[in-house]
Structure formats: structure tokens, C-alpha cells
């Protein structure tokens, strides 16, 4: 680890993404995880040199350069408020936010640099751009978004599907959604444009959850030093 390592606070450290973030950050000499926040009081206060805190103790979190949040909607407001209070950037991949929480995000972007995204993979960033272009180039074509995930994923359509739908809608399409929950599928998204006698399919398949964690860590590094505002993943990784 270098003396100028970026100090990272990971919020939602007990989830699948949180665990991946902890593991990958430990392998990155440019990062130092100064705190890991979990929902309940942790059974161990320090794991592999990383201090663990309960969500109720968030206000006492150590100094950090950037926070990364992959938690649940009910835990989102406190980490957003902490970052705004301390003037620190936030990277969040928490899905299922309601309109009030989205409004809070927009308000916070007046004070801090932040990026909220349903998906931090490089491939999905490219897919989103392609969907925008296809929707604008194929007016009048039917647009369908099919998404598949593991059986434990609760929100449907997925946040990524909705993001792709927003990209399509912004270019004039009217997307419909189909969701599948089966087995241990990490994540698959197909955006299908259907015209008369022809069909275009744009597909992204994730086979390893590490791609999302790597993208979030990369975005966190790039967000430091940015002026206040709401950024897209593609603004930071492409």
C-alpha cells in the first residue's frame, strides 16, 4: 500500500458486493479500506486489518476519501447524509430506491460528487451507449428488455434493466420488460429491437460478480477531485 493510498469506506460490507469490494481492494496497493459498515453489530471488530462498524455507528466512521455503498434502500439515507456532511464523494450501487431517495441524491449532488448506478461493469456502460444509438436509429421498432438474475434477487425489473430502458426511452423507444429469476445467474441483459422482417439484439452477460466491484473501485478513484455533481459510470470508466 502506498502512503498516498485512497481511503475508502465500504457501506454494505456483509453483502455479496461488499465482500467482493473488500477482497479486491485488499489486492490494490492504491487503496486502503479504513472502515467496513454492516447492518448489525459485527461479531469481529477487526477483520484482516479492516475495522468493522454497525450501521448504527456510521456517524463515528473514521476519515475517508470516498465511500462505496452497496446496501439496501433502508440503509441508503444515512450514508448519503454522512458523505454530504463531510463533503466526500459517494459511489452507490444500491438498487430499489424510491422517488424520495432519488430526490435526495439529486439534492446531494449539489454538494458532493457522486455516481449512482445499477451496474458498474465496463460492458454495461458500452451497452447503454449502444442502446441509445439503436433506439434513435430505429424509430418505430418494438423494444423489449429481458433480464435474468439469481433466485435471491428481489427487485424486478433489475436496476440495470431500468437504466437501459431509460437510455432507450431517451432516444424515443418505448421499452417493455421481462424478468427471470433462476439458479445462480449473475446477470444477463438483452435489449431487443424488432422491426418488420428483422430483429437486432444487444446482449451483456456477466459471469463473475467481480466485474461490478472492479468497476465501482475504479469509479471511486476517478470520482475523487471531481466537482460536485451527478456522474454516470461511462463518464468515469470509458
UniProtKB/Swiss-Prot annotation:
<dbReference type="GO" id="GO:0019877">
    <property type="term" value="P:diaminopimelate biosynthetic process"/>
</dbReference>
<keyword id="KW-0560">Oxidoreductase</keyword>
<feature type="binding site">
    <location>
        <begin position="117"/>
        <end position="120"/>
    </location>
    <ligand>
        <name>NAD(+)</name>
    </ligand>
</feature>
<dbReference type="GO" id="GO:0016726">
    <property type="term" value="F:oxidoreductase activity, acting on CH or CH2 groups, NAD or NADP as acceptor"/>
</dbReference>
<dbReference type="GO" id="GO:0050661">
    <property type="term" value="F:NADP binding"/>
</dbReference>
<feature type="active site" description="Proton donor/acceptor">
    <location>
        <position position="149"/>
    </location>
</feature>
<keyword id="KW-0520">NAD</keyword>
<feature type="binding site">
    <location>
        <begin position="12"/>
        <end position="17"/>
    </location>
    <ligand>
        <name>NAD(+)</name>
    </ligand>
</feature>
<dbReference type="GO" id="GO:0008839">
    <property type="term" value="F:4-hydroxy-tetrahydrodipicolinate reductase"/>
</dbReference>
<dbReference type="GO" id="GO:0005829">
    <property type="term" value="C:cytosol"/>
</dbReference>
<keyword id="KW-0028">Amino-acid biosynthesis</keyword>
<comment type="function">
    <text>Catalyzes the conversion of 4-hydroxy-tetrahydrodipicolinate (HTPA) to tetrahydrodipicolinate.</text>
</comment>
<keyword id="KW-0457">Lysine biosynthesis</keyword>
<feature type="binding site">
    <location>
        <begin position="93"/>
        <end position="95"/>
    </location>
    <ligand>
        <name>NAD(+)</name>
    </ligand>
</feature>
<comment type="similarity">
    <text>Belongs to the DapB family.</text>
</comment>
<comment type="pathway">
    <text>Amino-acid biosynthesis; L-lysine biosynthesis via DAP pathway; (S)-tetrahydrodipicolinate from L-aspartate: step 4/4.</text>
</comment>
<keyword id="KW-0963">Cytoplasm</keyword>
<dbReference type="GO" id="GO:0051287">
    <property type="term" value="F:NAD binding"/>
</dbReference>
<feature type="binding site">
    <location>
        <position position="150"/>
    </location>
    <ligand>
        <name>(S)-2,3,4,5-tetrahydrodipicolinate</name>
    </ligand>
</feature>
<dbReference type="InterPro" id="IPR036291">
    <property type="entry name" value="NAD(P)-bd_dom_sf"/>
</dbReference>
<dbReference type="Pfam" id="PF01113">
    <property type="entry name" value="DapB_N"/>
</dbReference>
<feature type="active site" description="Proton donor">
    <location>
        <position position="153"/>
    </location>
</feature>
<dbReference type="InterPro" id="IPR022664">
    <property type="entry name" value="DapB_N_CS"/>
</dbReference>
<dbReference type="InterPro" id="IPR022663">
    <property type="entry name" value="DapB_C"/>
</dbReference>
<keyword id="KW-0220">Diaminopimelate biosynthesis</keyword>
<keyword id="KW-0521">NADP</keyword>
<feature type="binding site">
    <location>
        <position position="40"/>
    </location>
    <ligand>
        <name>NADP(+)</name>
    </ligand>
</feature>
<dbReference type="GO" id="GO:0009089">
    <property type="term" value="P:lysine biosynthetic process via diaminopimelate"/>
</dbReference>
<dbReference type="Pfam" id="PF05173">
    <property type="entry name" value="DapB_C"/>
</dbReference>
<feature type="binding site">
    <location>
        <begin position="159"/>
        <end position="160"/>
    </location>
    <ligand>
        <name>(S)-2,3,4,5-tetrahydrodipicolinate</name>
    </ligand>
</feature>
<dbReference type="InterPro" id="IPR000846">
    <property type="entry name" value="DapB_N"/>
</dbReference>
<protein>
    <recommendedName>
        <fullName>4-hydroxy-tetrahydrodipicolinate reductase</fullName>
        <ecNumber>1.17.1.8</ecNumber>
    </recommendedName>
</protein>
<dbReference type="InterPro" id="IPR023940">
    <property type="entry name" value="DHDPR_bac"/>
</dbReference>
Amino acid at each position: 500500500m502506498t502512503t498516498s493510498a485512497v481511503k475508502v469506506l465500504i457501506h454494505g460490507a456483509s453483502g455479496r458486493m461488499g465482500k467482493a469490494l473488500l477482497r479486491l481492494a485488499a489486492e490494490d496497493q492504491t487503496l486502503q479500506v479504513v472502515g467496513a459498515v454492516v447492518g448489525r453489530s459485527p461479531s469481529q471488530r477487526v477483520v484482516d486489518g479492516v475495522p468493522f462498524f454497525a450501521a448504527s455507528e456510521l456517524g463515528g466512521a473514521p476519515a475517508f476519501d470516498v465511500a462505496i455503498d452497496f446496501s439496501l434502500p433502508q440503509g441508503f439515507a444515512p450514508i448519503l447524509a454522512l458523505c454530504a456532511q463531510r463533503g466526500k464523494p459517494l459511489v452507490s450501487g444500491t438498487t430499489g430506491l424510491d422517488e424520495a431517495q432519488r430526490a435526495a441524491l439529486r439534492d446531494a449532488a449539489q454538494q458532493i460528487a457522486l455516481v449512482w448506478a445499477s451496474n458498474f461493469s465496463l460492458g454495461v456502460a458500452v451497452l447503454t451507449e449502444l442502446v441509445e444509438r439503436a433506439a434513435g436509429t430505429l424509430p418505430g421498432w418494438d423494444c423489449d428488455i429481458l433480464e435474468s438474475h439469481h433466485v435471491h434477487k428481489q427487485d424486478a425489473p433489475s436496476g440495470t434493466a431500468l437504466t437501459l430502458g431509460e437510455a432507450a426511452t431517451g432516444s424515443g423507444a418505448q421499452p417493455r420488460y421481462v424478468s427471470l429469476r433462476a439458479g445462480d445467474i449473475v446477470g444477463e441483459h438483452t435489449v431487443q429491437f424488432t422491426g418488420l422482417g428483422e430483429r437486432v439484439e444487444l446482449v451483456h452477460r456477466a459471469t463473475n460478480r467481480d466485474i461490478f466491484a472492479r468497476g465501482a473501485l475504479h469509479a471511486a478513484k476517478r470520482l475523487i477531485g471531481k466537482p460536485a455533481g451527478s456522474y454516470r459510470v461511462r463518464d468515469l470508466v470509458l
